[in-house]
Amino acid sequence: GTWAQTFALLLSCFTILFGSTMAVREQHFKRRLAYSTVSNLSYIVLAASLMTQSGLTAALAHMLFHALIKITLFFCAGAVMVKTGRTQIEDLRGLSRVMPFTCAVYTVGAISLMGTPLLPGFVSKWLIGSAAIETGTAMGMVGVAALLISAVLTAIYLMGPAMSMYFRPL
């Protein structure tokens, strides 16, 4: 690839990890989701920067699936803030008793965005990883490594609120 392609791939890997790391550290519910968006939009840039048909297909799939999942998560966060005034992750404890449907929808969205098999988030991340591997390049492997590390961080920052909603007392 060209230097511009290499730069785009490196920058996308950096922002995937930066967004995920910042999301883990963020305690404000909606800001955590915003950092997650930075990371996930970088997945799209990574896939498109591969400059292959499968990379572009993966980018479009993740664009669609991420949009559907993330709007669901933001709607849940907004509903929590409007109904309870709670904005911090630590304040979500016991919320499933007050807003069971909202918490259930958030949890389904979270496990999908984490990349749980058979859910949309898994499909698009699988397509991105497969497209990166198909390139047979070192940068493709760097992209796969960034995706795998980010998947672990995504589980941490999205399941933290869910665990608090269900398993921490009021």
Residue ranges of model-derived segments:
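Hydrophobic transmembrane alpha-helices and their helix-loop junctions in integral membrane proteins
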Residues: 1-165
